[in-house]
């Protein structure tokens, strides 16, 4: 096995290698927390800072003077105002908050983009992705590595075609993001459900029964008793997952399980920020209204810590 094959196998095996038989595998795609801080504006605005900027970027604003914070906040506002009409709406603010919280996704896409846009034309074709990902292992397969690369490639191609909205087999940056992180896009959620069901549905009848459901998240270790969480999951399946009580989950029931429609924290925070900053109560914010409430959005220190501090200038 050459180095490329080894690295590919390593990446595929990592999740399995780190798992223990009694550990629970979580199939549910959770929305990330906006902040791990308590949301109490009467004490401080730390939660709002984390939500608006992302936790790491919020730390960099703590190093700035009020004047510097206002200047950088003004630049951010221009980016939030998508339609450039001079106002920031709840929807635009919600979109920004979601972007700030999911910046790691964009960083992952940028990293992978460089390795797959082989001709550097600002697009990634299916052929480029296939050659970069599967070229070596398909040309010289190792029968002992335990992976069916042709099957994996077929599955990747199906997902790529789903992400590729115009059907030209060439992905833009946005389409490539949908391919790599389909759970983040509404139009990709069916493929997330389909792939999940294919993984779990061992008898290929198009449903997930109780034993398949438990078998996916728990590997029985010899004669050991089942952990309590496994018993709880059995109860969850019967009481909540299998909504029509037919002993198995269909596509809709599986979708409700792995892609729950939880409370939208980003929208709640966006509405809160608009409510607190909207001086003329027209339901949207101007740059001036946002900068006037800079302490709510980004905060700052009252003093300049000097040149010794390393400041991040992503914005």
Swiss-Prot record:
It is found in: Endoplasmic reticulum membrane; Golgi apparatus; Secreted; Melanosome. Belongs to the CREC family. Interacts with GGCX. Ca(2+) 6 binds at residues 278, 280, 282, 284, 289. PROSITE patterns: EF_HAND_1, EF_HAND_2. InterPro entries: EF-hand-dom_pair, EF_Hand_1_Ca_BS, EF_hand_dom. The modification Phosphothreonine is found at residues 65, 254. Ca(2+) 5 binds at residues 242, 244, 246, 248, 253. Its main location: endoplasmic reticulum. Ca(2+) 1 binds at residues 81, 83, 85, 92. Transmembrane segments: none annotated. The gene is Calu. This is Calumenin. One of its GO terms (molecular function) is calcium ion binding. It holds the Pfam family EF-hand_5. The keyword Mitochondrion does not apply. Ca(2+) 4 binds at residues 201, 203, 205, 212. Residues 1-19 form the signal peptide. GO terms for cellular component: endoplasmic reticulum; endoplasmic reticulum lumen; endoplasmic reticulum membrane; extracellular region; Golgi apparatus; melanosome; sarcoplasmic reticulum lumen. Ca(2+) 2 binds at residues 117, 119, 121, 128. CDD domains: EFh_CREC_Calumenin. Involved in regulation of vitamin K-dependent carboxylation of multiple N-terminal glutamate residues. Seems to inhibit gamma-carboxylase GGCX. Binds 7 calcium ions with a low affinity. The modification Phosphotyrosine is found at residue 47. Glycans are attached at residue 131. Residues 68-103, 104-139, 151-186, 188-223, 229-264, 265-300 form the EF-hand domain. The modification N6-acetyllysine is found at residue 165.
